[in-house]
Amino acid sequence: MDFITINSINKTEEFALKQVAKQATSSLLYRLGKTIILASVCVERELVSEDFLPLVVQFLEKSYAAGKIPGGFVKREGRAQDFEILTSRLIDRTLRPLFPKDYRYPTQITLMVLSHDIENDLQVSALNAASAALFLAHAAPFKSVSACRIARIDNEFIINPSTSLLNQSSLDLFVSGTKESLNMIEMRSLGQKLNALEEPLMLEALELAQKSLKETCTLYEETFTPHQNALLFKESQGIVFNERLLDLLKNQYFNEIIKGIESSALSERENVFNEIARKISEAHSEFNLEEIELSLEKVKKTEIRRMIIRDKIRPDKRALEEVRPISIESNLLPMAHSSILFTRGQTQSLVVGVLGTDNDAQTHESLEHKAPIKERFMFHYNFPPFCVGEASSIGATSRRELGHGNLAKRALETSIKNKDQVIRLVSEILESNGSSSMASVCAGSLALYASGVEIHDLVAGVAMGMVSEGQDYAILSDISGLEDAEGDMDFKIAGNLEGITAMQMDTKMSGIQLEILYQTLLQAKRVREHILKIMHEAKEKIVINFSHLPTTEIFNVAPDKIIEIIGQGGRVIREIVEKFEVKIDLNKPSGEVKIMGNKERVLKTKEFILNYLHSLDQELEQYAIDEVLEAQVKRIVDFGAFLSLPKGGEGLLRKQHMERCQVALKEGDSIRCRVISFNKGKIALDLA
């Protein structure tokens, strides 16, 4: 068992090697203060034949890590929570580019949170633990990678802030990479204002992150290299292509390949390439279908990159900075509070907005918070198979759908002025040919406005890409699905005219240089300006249907009257909600009543509640202390009996008064009783 301590910027990390989970390929216990994470890597030695990287990353939170028992009916951890899925994606997207292109050994990385202090950053800790475990496993010649988070408080950048400091920040920037370059970025603005960050300041933050990562990665490599396992698998020489087959494709089928590349729809493109493969397979039996498809893919990729880098022309004939045609329609769905159809080329997003009450907010439990938190702004992204021409069933929400919805939410959240509003936006992707999450941001921003939600400014998003060959590279604006698949970078950037509110960068390379990232940010700003101009023109044409939008009426009653509005077993409030078709939130301690719904119904509901409470007060005023009444038993309960009083209303005869007089009552009996007190709007009775 080995213990390693590493001191880096603003934190001291401890690693216990070979202490637990020793049957895994590698394992360690990561400790940062009171946060402890078990990281394990398991690598199977049997190759898989499929052409993909068989990597699985799972980040798991245990409730006991914070001294909690899981909420809900089942008292054990079940389906992964959103934070766990998003953190798993964060780690996967960082580590995946490090693997050799022909790595085909099933690999599982598991991060299990065993103890957690909420002041520590779980995502940075989990990624650093995963990186160390993968480096120690030595399944392939990996570079060391690490993560850091950057906050901005009072115009000063802070590296690896505590949770309490991050809550005061206007910036949340998560960056991971090697000591040479960055390979994954997540960013969002924070606070009550929009807090969009200008591009020069973003570069400054990224430079600070790069410096931190370089220091940490250097320490990791120096410290962990002596503890690495023996190299399990050496990097192979890659696929050996048949030169005769490549020449055949370039000479006889080149025009058909170009036709496939220029096909805008994914299904159409696949049909072209499948037909080429079929023709060659039938005409040349010496080549098997697998090597034909691999060679075809190589020629296609080479030609796409040549077109972009040498000719500065993209597969769909656009210039490098050209954005596809944009159209925007509003108020398509008459019963929704808002609906926006945003179309950019062959990517189409229908975003629907609905406003709700406090009861509609999504409640989450997390190790990051002591108590359950309420998510008031929700953005749900759906990617049905028909949007890319696939014939398959629609299943549960995928990791990708959850991630894209979270990105859109982060882009728009600070644009909302009133953070107490409960808002749900749903993006239905009806067509997809790249950049659907950024189309969702554009449509979502307009949907907020169309719902009558006050916003600081419109927010637009664009997906940027890059293609590189050696020292040459080209940055692409508004990438298509083909450019995303064949390119080296997917950089989604959202913001307004002033700066950036959210961004997400992934790469298929080992990393991207800061100079290229900054050029991409500046190019994306020009694209945003173009898109925002179109969005502002569309905004002017939106007619907000205030008569259909829900309105909220808030008023106060005496706190002891709230129970009267609720009624026995919730009977009264259920009847009110069903009668007027509204939503009601009640606050017992303060006596606040919040009604939400159609304006006319809301006003009628308020009037009904006030009249109802007034009538109850009048009933009480008819009776006096020590007044003797002839009452009728209305219902028997465990603690006594409720009696109907002769002048209206009801009173409670408690069980102890019945037992003292040895009276056995049943419903419908008449009995003489005496008023003994008024308590919180209730009449207490005794036998006369």
Curated annotation (Swiss-Prot):
Q: Per the record, a Pfam family?
A: RNase_PH
Q: Which cofactor does it need?
A: Mg(2+)
InterPro entries the record matches = ExoRNase_PH_dom1 (IPR001247), ExoRNase_PH_dom2 (IPR015847), ExoRNase_PH_dom2_sf (IPR036345), KH_dom (IPR004087), KH_dom_type_1 (IPR004088), KH_dom_type_1_sf (IPR036612), NA-bd_OB-fold (IPR012340), PNPase (IPR012162)
The UniProt record lists the KH domain at 550-609
Single biological process term from Gene Ontology: RNA processing
Where mainly found?
cytoplasm
The S1 motif domain sits at 626-688
User: Looking at the keywords, is RNA-binding present?
Assistant: yes
Q: Which UniProt keywords apply?
A: Cytoplasm, Magnesium, Metal-binding, Nucleotidyltransferase, RNA-binding, Transferase
Top enzyme class: transferase
Q: Where does Mg(2+) bind?
A: 484, 490
CDD domains linked: KH-I_PNPase, RNase_PH_PNPase_2
List, alphabetically, the NCBIfam families matched. polynuc_phos (TIGR03591), PRK11824.1 (NF008805)
Q: What's this protein's name?
A: Polyribonucleotide nucleotidyltransferase
Q: Which organism is it from?
A: Helicobacter acinonychis (strain Sheeba)
